[in-house]
Structures are given as structure tokens and as C-alpha cells.
Amino acid sequence: MRRITLTGTALAVLLLLLLGGVAIAGATPAATPDKAKTLHLDLQFSPFKLIDVDHDGGPSLGDYVIFHDLLSSRGKQIGDEGGTCPIVDATEGLIHCTGTMRLPGGQIAFQGLTTAAPTKELAVTGGTGRYQGAGGEATLVELGDGTGTLTVRLRR
């Protein structure tokens, strides 16, 4: 496989397409009676790699992105997240992202289909440590400047 480092417009398009990976960290959760927690975090996107499986020079079916981003709360880095997003429909810009957030006290797994829309919804599919048995959803909003916000609603 050939690794391609993207620049310019291609990087911007793929960043919007493929960083549906959400981020969550040890932010102070807001507890509710049904044992739900809501975490509000900031996300700093890091460079990522597009693996061009068919060597055609652009995003196509089966190509994928590997990502690793930083998570912060109140201006302090408190975790990170990483994963992969294979392209499942290049015409529609559809990707299926899976990843894991590494946080103080445990990890949270996520996945889902997403597109280039600046707001992305993904499922929380489990966790370890203090997040063991967690489910829920995460909403990522890309701010267009290499940063984003993340709201994670956890249920047990």
C-alpha cells in the first residue's frame, strides 16, 4: 500500500469527510436521574493519513483514513482519540468510522456512518473502566478551523 499525505483542497475535503471520529474526555459530566452523563469537550484535529488502497490518487471505495486527535476541556488536554474510516461510497462521500477515545479512568468506543456535513452523529458502543457498559451518542460539530466541539450523551 502507498501512503499519501494530502495537502490543500484534497486535505480540506477529506478532513471534513473523514474526521467523523468523535472525541470525549474526562470533562465534568452533568448527571441526570436516569444515570445519563453529558460530556462537553473541545477537539483539536491532528494530521491524518489516507491509505490509497487502489493507488488511483484520490478517495475511492475501500480507501481509508487513519486519525488521531487531541481532546481538551477548559483549555487543558485531557485525552485523545483515534481510529479508522473506510470509504464505503465515494460518490456519496459516505464513510464508516470506528474509533476509541482514551480518557482519564477508561476508554469509550464509537462508530457510525457519516458524511462531509459539519455536524456528525455517531453511536457510543461501549467502554472500559468508569465507562464500562456505556452506550449513547456523540455529536461532533466541526468549526472549520481545525477544531471542533463534541457533546457525548452516555447512558448505562
Functional labels for PLM-detected ranges:
Residues 1-11:
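Bacterial N-terminal signal peptides that target proteins for export
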Residues 9-21:
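Bacterial N-terminal signal peptides
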Residues 23-26:
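Signal peptide cleavage region of secreted peptide precursors
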Residues 28-156:
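Beta-strand-enriched cores of mature, soluble protein domains
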